[in-house]
Design a protein with these regions (language model features):
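Extended beta-strand/beta-hairpin segments
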Residues: 1-52, 60-146
Length: 146
């Protein structure tokens, strides 16, 4: 087994109406409670970062999966939506829905349509974030081939 450590440091001052900082090797972002939840809404927030992590992981995994399947001349634009709920006073991410729009050459479109379901599952199974949250968060994938 190989382990990889991903180190992020966070800073916060006392109180919910403050702005903190999340810092890693590349990330350097202000963080706060979103305004939709009564916070100051400056910078990003953990909910958005969770959806961004899931989305970026999935799109990278999907691109690699398509490349290995010899679909080389493609582009992917994806929107991901995280749906959270408040139940018994606790917030929980219930679902993350990925909607990848895959542009492919006309000559490869039919072949991709035939193999797409299997390739989507492979990509999801190779995504570390999907593997980490599966069972706690419902992951939906609604692809479009352009």
């Amino acid at each position: 087994m190989t382990n990889h450590d991903f180190i992020v440091t966070t800073q916060w001052s006392v109180g919910r109406d403050e702005v903190g900082l999340a810092k890693g090797d590349v990330i350097n972002e202000s963080i706060s409670i979103p305004s939709s939840l009564g916070g100051v809404g400056e910078g990003t927030n953990p909910d958005e970062m969770l959806v961004a992590a899931a989305s970026s992981c999935y799109i990278i995994s999907l691109a690699a999966t398509l490349e290995r399947a010899h679909f080389n001349d493609i582009s992917i634009n994806q929107e991901s939506v995280g749906t959270a709920s408040l139940t018994n006073g606790k917030f929980k991410m219930e679902q993350i829905k990925h909607q990848p729009k895959i542009s492919v050459e006309a000559s490869q479109k039919e072949a991709l349509e035939k193999r797409l379901d299997k390739l989507l599952k492979i990509a999801d199974n190779n995504c570390m974030i999907s593997n980490s949250i599966r069972g706690n968060v419902d992951i939906k994938i609604e692809p479009y081939i352009l």
